[in-house]
Design a protein with these regions (language model features):
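Structural signature of extracellular appendage/secretion-system components
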Residues: 1-447
Length: 447
């Protein structure tokens, strides 16, 4: 009944595994005699131990499923956040801003002398440069947050490894001394699941009751000893170098699973498929393509005063192109809208600039290709994350079907034990009544 109460009290405790008293019947005591002593009843019941009703195979399945789920969930969440920030397709997206920019040049080609059309084109250009810079900053901020989370995750793994090692020692000592370390095992399994979710670690219960956790094939925890992981790599997306994990002795630890593995994949360099670095590169490429294509045509024209056209966009050196893109002209008089010798009312250069938006290798095509690529990869990551999460839920459900506490079952067990106690009490009462008759009433006949 005490154990039933323990199960019921911990019904909602995370990681708790239900327990059961294991009993066996005691045989009749042996009697040394030259004569037959006849049939003898057994000596009752023996409590052999308190069993923890867990399943090591199901526990291992949960750890594996959590590792896969952690990886794809981390990747999908980062990709979805980046995709949402693009706001494509919508009126707030960069594609719409580019369309308005080219339309403004088309208006200028029709009305080269219009101050309003020139002002609209310049305003549209400034809106594009601002949105490119804002988009790039959003990506770099997301990258920095993800990079900081790598440090936090590694610290969490190291702390959990130390706790698991300490619990391993306590569990081993308890088993050797004949104790029941069930609650300690529950705490250890919960920590092991957290480590698996973060790193995709695999585990094996040894013959002495300790749990060995391995990351990248090497032991993170073995017995009462734990190893630590370290993080090296840049703190800025502009560095373009990978963030790596290593053991304390400097040996690389390749983590390709769990939330940590997913986050490392997200912040990887663009050449290695990093979604954030890839998006940052798209912003830089767009800024460079926009400046190159527009400046090439703009320099071929002349202003209303007949002066040669200069650069329309400028990219300041010493930093990312997306952040350093700016608009050079400040008014209509600095816009080169006409071809040389065609007159001040010619708008052929403006028309040529407007046509850049339709080029197959133009800024629009580059941006749309980057957005489409991100959308495809995000959809794939979301799909795999959904499947991995379903696998984790199924594995956890299977584990709980064996290890979880069922309130109805425990209530039935409590009633069973209560009935057994009542029956045992009735046996004692019957024996007491028989002894009373034997002692107090025997030999009274005839008095």
């Amino acid at each position: 009944m005490d154990l039933v109460g323990q199960n019921i009290a911990n019904q909602n405790t995370a990681g708790y595994t239900r327990q059961r008293v294991e009993t066996s019947a005691l045989g009749a005591a042996g009697v040394n005699s030259r004569f037959s002593v006849g049939a003898r009843p057994g000596e009752g019941v023996s409590i052999d131990g308190i069993a923890r009703l867990g399943d090591a195979v199901l526990d291992s399945r949960v750890r594996d499923a959590l590792g896969a789920s952690g990886f794809w969930t981390a990747k999908a969440a980062a990709a979805a956040t980046a995709e949402e920030a693009l706001a494509e397709p919508s009126i707030d997206g960069l594609s719409n801003k580019l369309s308005k920019f080219w339309a403004g040049w088309q208006d200028l080609s029709n009305s080269p002398d219009s101050v309003a059309a020139a002002s609209a084109a310049l305003t549209s250009a400034q809106a594009i440069t601002a949105q490119i810079a804002d988009g790039y900053r959003a990506v770099t901020n997301q990258w920095s947050d993800a990079r900081a989370s790598v440090d936090q995750k590694v610290s969490s793994v190291n702390a959990a490894a130390d706790q698991i090692a300490a619990l391993n020692g306590a569990i081993r000592d308890s088993i050797n001394s004949g104790g029941t370390p069930n609650e300690l095992i529950d705490r250890r399994n919960l920590l092991a699941q957290n480590v698996a979710r973060l790193t995709g670690a695999t585990g094996k219960v040894e013959t002495d009751g300790t749990l060995t956790l391995r990351v990248d094939g090497n032991p993170l925890v073995a017995g009462s000893q734990a190893k630590h992981l370290t993080v090296t790599g840049p703190q800025s997306i502009e560095a373009g170098a990978p963030t790596t994990i290593a053991w304390e002795n400097g040996t690389p630890a390749v983590i390709t699973n769990g939330e940590l593995g997913g986050t490392l994949a997200v912040i990887a360099p663009a050449a290695d498929g990093g979604v954030l670095a890839g998006l940052a590169k798209t912003y830089n490429d767009l800024a460079e393509a926009l400046a190159d294509k527009v400046n090439t045509v703009h320099r071929s024209g002349v202003t209303a005063d007949g002066d040669p056209g200069g650069d329309f966009f400028a990219i300041a050196p010493g930093g990312p192109a997306a952040l350093n893109l700016s608009v050079v002209p400040t008014g209509r008089d600095q816009l080169a809208l006409a071809a040389p010798g065609a007159g001040s009312l010619d708008g052929s250069i403006a028309d040529a600039i407007a046509g850049i938006g339709d080029l197959k290798d133009g800024p629009d095509a580059l941006w749309n290709g980057g957005v489409a690529s991100l959308a495809v990869s995000t959809a794939a990551d979301k799909s795999r994350a959904t499947a991995a999460e379903a696998g984790a839920v199924a594995a956890t459900s299977a584990q709980l079907s064996v290890a979880g506490v069922d309130g109805d079952e425990e209530a039935l067990n409590l009633l069973t034990h209560q009935t057994a106690y009542n029956a045992a009490a009735r046996v004692l009462t019957a024996i007491d009544e028989a002894l009373d008759i034997l002692i107090n009433r025997t030999g009274l006949v005839g008095r």
